[in-house]
A protein has these predicted regions:
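HIT superfamily nucleotide-processing domains
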Residues: 1-142
Length: 142
């Protein structure tokens, strides 16, 4: 008997899960909050299996991802009143993820990039919960 192969399933890379809190799901991407209170920092992870680079997504998913990045960037800017947004698909975790980081003049790394600027400062639960609630008020997560 020939049993059809099961399609691959998506799961969050353990390193991304260890460093973040789940905010919710958009049509394509899971939205995570990086556990670093030095910077309001979101991570979007497309919920597609075996995707490492943006170019691994089909054209439609690439367009959806950029719309979701823009949506989250606008919300993060409004919620944090930041001076600048940093948006990047950077790092070596072998699962596509896009960082959206709110920056303020005088933050712990300003004006340098946040990567490698110093140790993360984990969120206290009330501070994290306030930021997550503010973001959820602006976006209808699935």
């Amino acid at each position: 008997m020939n049993v059809p192969a099961q399609p691959p399933t998506w799961s969050l890379h353990p390193q991304l899960g260890a460093d973040t809190s789940n905010i919710g799901d958009l049509p394509l991407a899971r939205v995570l909050l990086m556990n670093d209170a030095n910077y309001p920092w979101l991570v979007l992870v497309p919920r597609r299996p075996d995707i490492v680079e943006v170019i691994d997504l089909d054209d439609e998913d690439q367009e959806i991802l950029w719309r979701e990045i823009a949506l989250l960037a606008r919300v993060l800017k409004d919620v944090t009143q930041c001076d600048k947004l940093n948006i990047a698909a950077i790092g070596n975790v072998p699962q596509l993820h896009v960082h959206v980081v709110a920056r303020r003049r005088g933050d712990a790394a300003w004006p340098r990039p946040v990567w490698g600027a110093g140790p993360p400062r984990p969120y206290e639960a009330p501070e994290r919960d306030r930021l997550v609630a503010a973001i959820r008020r602006e976006i209808a997560f699935g």
